[in-house]
């Protein structure tokens, strides 16, 4: 199967944004600085952005902002730190972070692309800031309801036991 994504691309800018409450979020921009503004929201929660996610956008047409949400990837505070205070890591905080990033980059309206948990966050952002969303692309949609989380974390193993066991063997006994 051929990879349908765009060629690999490196960021032309990146940084850390202090969003308060002891949190700093890592962000990066890639593509065409004069292109149509777009935001990528990664899944997880807990993961972060990766180079392959830059390839979802045509680099000639889009100016893409990607960021590691609070507690994820290169952002600080990390949720994996023992006894980390996560009280300031809520959906409302993440929505405020997106708005801070939008203002930082001088974007009036942008296309929002979310994957998995990013679809949930993207929908919540669009509800709170509809005037700032030009279009939405939602992939691997989940609303992270209790039933969906149970499906992902337990039930899927009954249907795909071999794949589930392969996945479990790759998960460390204790996270760093």
Question: Where are the predicted features?
Answer:
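Conserved HGGG/HGGXW glycine-rich cap/lid loop of the alpha/beta-hydrolase fold
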Residues: 18-78
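A catalytic-pocket lid/entrance helix-loop region that shapes and gates access to the active site
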Residues: 131-176
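An N-terminal hydrophobic leader/cap segment in hydrolases
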Residues: 1-16
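Short beta-strand or tight-loop elements
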Residues: 13, 23-25, 108
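Serine-hydrolase catalytic machinery in alpha/beta-hydrolase-like enzymes
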Residues: 73-82, 170-176
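Conserved hydrolase catalytic core segment
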Residues: 108-147
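Conserved acidic catalytic loop of the alpha/beta-hydrolase fold
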Residues: 92-110
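Catalytic nucleophile-loop/oxyanion-hole region of alpha/beta-hydrolase
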Residues: 79-94, 147-156
């Amino acid at each position: 199967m051929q990879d349908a994504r765009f060629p690999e691309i490196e960021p032309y800018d990146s940084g850390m944004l202090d969003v308060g409450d002891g949190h700093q979020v890592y962000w990066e921009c890639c593509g065409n600085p004069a292109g149509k503004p777009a935001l990528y929201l990664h899944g997880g929660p807990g993961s972060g952005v990766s180079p392959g996610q830059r390839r979802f956008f045509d680099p000639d047409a889009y100016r893409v902002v990607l960021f590691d949400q609070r507690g994820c990837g290169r952002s600080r505070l990390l949720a994996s730190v023992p006894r980390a205070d996560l009280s300031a890591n809520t959906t409302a905080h993440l929505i405020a972070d997106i708005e801070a990033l939008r203002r930082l980059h001088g974007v009036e309206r942008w296309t929002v692309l979310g994957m998995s948990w990013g679809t949930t966050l993207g929908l919540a952002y669009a509800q709170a800031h509809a005037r700032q969303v030009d279009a939405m692309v939602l992939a691997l949609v989940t609303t992270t309801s209790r039933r969906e989380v149970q499906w992902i974390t337990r039930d899927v193993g009954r249907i795909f036991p071999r794949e589930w066991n392969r996945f479990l063997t790759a998960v460390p006994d204790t996270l760093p």
